Amino acid sequence: MDKKSARIRRAARARHMMREQGVTRLVIHRTPRHIYAQVIAPNGSEVLAAASTVEKAIREQVKYTGNKDAAAAVGKAVAERALAKGVQAVAFDRSGFKYHGRVQTLADAAREAGLQF
């Protein structure tokens, strides 16, 4: 089993648990250059809020899009957008990535901006 398939297996197991609980999820995806975050409704078919380093507004705030500063900007932005839609509590879906580095920074920034998880 290679690294990618192991990560996907971990993500599938976590998503199955969250789907059974019926909670709103904060889903992240990480690439070497960008980081993406979405708040997905409990039914799994509706994106309530989203933010990523691909957006022009966030790219203007940071010097480089693949570091912790960029992840913090995305975390803050997605939390503000989710709170504006009335979402206050979410489950953190790290998509099988380790809770370390940019993933942890995004989560901490979202918590500081007011999301609860």
UniProtKB/Swiss-Prot annotation:
Record GO biological process: translation
Annotated GO MF terms: 5S rRNA binding; structural constituent of ribosome
GO CC entries: cytosolic large ribosomal subunit
InterPro entries: Ribosomal_uL18_bac-type, Ribosomal_uL18_bac/euk
Quaternary structure and partners: Part of the 50S ribosomal subunit; part of the 5S rRNA/L5/L18/L25 subcomplex. Contacts the 5S and 23S rRNAs.
NCBIfam families with a match to the protein in the record: L18_bact
Function field: This is one of the proteins that bind and probably mediate the attachment of the 5S RNA into the large ribosomal subunit, where it forms part of the central protuberance.
Family label: Belongs to the universal ribosomal protein uL18 family.
Name recorded for this polypeptide: Large ribosomal subunit protein uL18
Gene giving rise to this polypeptide: rplR
